[in-house]
Amino acid sequence: MEINEEREKLIKKLKEFFQQNAENFKLSLALLFGSWAQGSPRRDSDVDIAVFFEEGKIDKEEKKALVRKITALLEERIKREVSILIIDPALSKPMVYYNALVSGIPLYVSDSSLLHHLRMDAIHEMEDFSSRGLKWQMELAGKYLKGK
């Protein structure tokens, strides 16, 4: 199967999954990002999905448990490794959030204004991050990789 055909089938399966299950998992948003969204996956590429849970309805531990459950169900369904990013505006990961929110393909959106708001926040965060310069970004990345 050609990679573009495989990509379209994958997106269709993911959209069906999230349309059927988003409410059960208390999701407001699910986006495909990374190599599959960009159209440049390798045969062994994992599937990167960003999710945003309904605000104020579940705690951090329940979110982690739901991510494990979603991951297991998706991996069984699509026969690929799945990596899920929880979108949490309180955490600062501007590059990852920017990639997921701005370049991602919507799989499930309960409220388009929420997606718009999160995208605008990601763009502003990235602009702030970029304005500090490459040297600062490299230092920050180095600290992050060292676990500091």
Task: Describe the function of each predicted region.
Residues 1-29, 38-39, 43, 60-148:
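Catalytic core of pol beta-like nucleotidyltransferases
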Residues 33-35:
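Glycine-rich beta-strand-to-loop/alpha-helix junction loops that act as flexible
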Residues 50-54:
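Short hydrophobic/aromatic beta-strand micro-patches
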Residues 57:
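Short acidic, S/G/P-rich loop/turn micro-motifs used as interaction or catalytic elements
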